[in-house]
Amino acid sequence: MNDLLPAAAAPAGARALPLRHADPEIWRAVDAERQRQMHSIELIASENFVSQAVLDAQGSVMTNKYAEGYPGRRYYGGCRHVDVAERAAIERARRLFGCEYANVQPHSGSQANQAVYLALLAPGDRILGLDLKAGGHLTHGAHVNLSGKWFEALSYGVDPVSHRIDMDEVERTARRERPRLIIAGGSAYARVPDFARFRAIADATGALFVADMAHYAGLVAGGAFPSPVPFAHVTTTTTHKTLRGPRGGMILTDDADIARRIDAAVFPGLQGGPLMHVIAAKAVALGEALQPGFRAYARAVIDNARALCARLAEGGLSIVSGGTDCHLGVVDLRPWGLAGNAAERALEEAGITVNKNAVPGDAASPAVTSGIRVGSAACTSRGMGPAEFRQIGDLVLAVLGGLRDGGQAGGRDAVPARAAELSRRFPLPY
């Protein structure tokens, strides 16, 4: 009869079963994903491999706890232990990025940006961000996003030759349009933004300057990439990507008034209960980033990205902006007559994961694109170095070369085995 009981009425022992026995379908999906991560080359720039400690914290009993509010100011009882975790995350974020205030509750980078808009803008205000096809992010004013629907979104681009942000265009647009908010950062821009000039332009035009460092926060934490925090009124970030933590968001500022407004925007303005198991995992990841070894990791990420981009360029591929200053590179496939979606598909069949990506001046649809984005953070976490990334570059060239020459999945015969062997040499800890 017990197998007919609803879950809530099932014996306590049934609820103690491990996933493998409690829900075999989902266990198989989870294990298959673990195997995929273990045996493939991960080049998606926004992905990384967290530590076992981060996994442990995120899978902990803190997922059971509701904790609306902030440490010491909760709307629920029984929060003394989750308060320890959130306070630790806040203090570690402040130490790591050298700021006065940190809100660690946003569920994602997108919600961190939304909270900033809610705190600092009124509907219809003007915002100025990097154009999506030039490497910007949806939440910086794309017309399909809330940021482009609720606000008057303007964009700046990159120089058509150097593919670097045209700061003169930023200044001209800001002086002419007088945006309330200027945003620096993106999801596919490989160079260091001029944070000092962004702030100067904002000050000269009466705007607030927001830096979105979601992609390079870990590089900033490791001292390998300039920090926007001293220049921006507000800095937003994710806690995964190069920071190598759980999926989530965070907001940093040195301004007490802005901090109060952001806290109110996050809760109760945008979110209800924070995800305390995720915040605990954020604290763990931030603690890891404070360790001396993380600085070596951050430097290695950039060295590896440069090695990969250099090898791809040597093989005849066009790298947007000619290289990279961070963990990612964008490959313009138009000279090879390839579409981004076809390249993504062929590489995945060969055991190499990338994402299709728009390139400056792209006429293709977002579902097709004319480029791919590659990144080094994940494979660097596995211990790979420049020599391995040059090998990865050779594998990518073999696949795309075969595709260009007429094969639907170029390099199908040779590349998968080589990619799998490289993965086996650098196993994941789980």
UniProtKB/Swiss-Prot annotation:
Organism of this sequence: Bordetella bronchiseptica (strain ATCC BAA-588 / NCTC 13252 / RB50)
Protein's recorded name: Serine hydroxymethyltransferase 1
Binding of (6S)-5,6,7,8-tetrahydrofolate, residues: 132, 136-138
Residue positions, PTM N6-(pyridoxal phosphate)lysine: 241
InterPro entries from the UniProt entry: PyrdxlP-dep_Trfase, PyrdxlP-dep_Trfase_major, PyrdxlP-dep_Trfase_small, Ser_HO-MeTrfase, Ser_HO-MeTrfase-like, Ser_HO-MeTrfase_PLP_BS, SHMT-like_dom
Catalyses which reaction(s): (6R)-5,10-methylene-5,6,7,8-tetrahydrofolate + glycine + H2O = (6S)-5,6,7,8-tetrahydrofolate + L-serine
Required cofactor names: pyridoxal 5'-phosphate
HAMAP family assigned to the protein according to its UniProt record, in alphabetical order: SHMT
NCBIfam families listed in its UniProt record: PRK00011.1
The organism's taxonomic lineage, starting at the top: Bacteria, Pseudomonadati, Pseudomonadota, Betaproteobacteria, Burkholderiales
Pathway: One-carbon metabolism; tetrahydrofolate interconversion; Amino-acid biosynthesis; glycine biosynthesis; glycine from L-serine: step 1/1
The enzyme's E.C. designation: 2.1.2.1
The family this protein is said to belong to: Belongs to the SHMT family.
Residue(s) at site: Plays an important role in substrate specificity: 240
Enzyme class: transferase
Function summary: Catalyzes the reversible interconversion of serine and glycine with tetrahydrofolate (THF) serving as the one-carbon carrier. This reaction serves as the major source of one-carbon groups required for the biosynthesis of purines, thymidylate, methionine, and other important biomolecules. Also exhibits THF-independent aldolase activity toward beta-hydroxyamino acids, producing glycine and aldehydes, via a retro-aldol mechanism.
One Gene Ontology term, aspect cellular component: cytosol
GO molecular function: glycine hydroxymethyltransferase activity; pyridoxal phosphate binding
